[in-house]
């Protein structure tokens, strides 16, 4: 099944409601991009424990609850880089929507450390969808991005401001210029 077909299947199974539909779109985009047919690969890509993934996916896509239940029994040890854990902590400290925000915090934290622009790492269609995600789920943090920095650069800068540490993210495009302007 292609990524586009997985996305369509997930969206057909999404819970009704405007804001939930937007959340479902963001999560379905990430899941469709990450899913390779292997539960362990999906869980690893999403950056949460199997039980957490099954819970939030069942919440957003109730018609597929039975399918996601298989993730609960998955024997999988989640591994995360120290920067990813710091980013996740920063994001969850500003999360506003419960289980969905926690999943998105894990996705964003993992995506920041990957090479593509963050919106692409999350499987989104454009940077505007990432902006919406940050405003909706991490409003307090998003409000601090007053210089319109790229999100990877902003989150790395926020980590540095928060705890004085560095973030080893791969910055791309405008993220590079924005980070270079504020990092030192």
Map each language-model feature to its residues.
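Cys/His-clustered metal-coordination modules, chiefly Zn-binding fingers
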Residues: 133-184
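Hydrophobic, aromatic-lined core segments that form the binding pocket/scaffold
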Residues: 1-154
């Amino acid at each position: 099944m292609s990524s586009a077909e997985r996305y369509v299947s997930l969206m057909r199974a999404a819970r009704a409601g405007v804001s939930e539909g937007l959340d479902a779109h963001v999560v379905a985009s990430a899941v469709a991009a990450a899913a390779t047919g292997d539960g362990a690969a999906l869980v690893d890509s999403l950056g949460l424990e199997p039980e957490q993934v099954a819970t939030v996916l069942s919440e957003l896509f109730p018609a597929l609850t039975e399918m996601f239940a298989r993730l609960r029994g998955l024997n999988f040890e989640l591994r995360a880089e120290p920067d990813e854990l710091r980013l996740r902590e920063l994001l969850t400290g500003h999360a506003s929507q419960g289980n969905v925000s926690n999943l998105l915090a894990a996705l964003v934290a993992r995506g920041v450390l990957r090479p593509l622009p963050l919106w692409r790492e999350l499987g989104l269609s454009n940077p505007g969808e990432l902006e919406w995600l940050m405003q909706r789920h991490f409003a307090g943090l998003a409000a601090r991005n007053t210089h319109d920095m790229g999100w990877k650069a902003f989150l790395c800068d926020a980590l540095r401001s928060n705890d004085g540490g560095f973030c080893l993210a791969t910055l791309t495009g405008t993220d590079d210029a924005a980070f270079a302007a504020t990092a030192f």
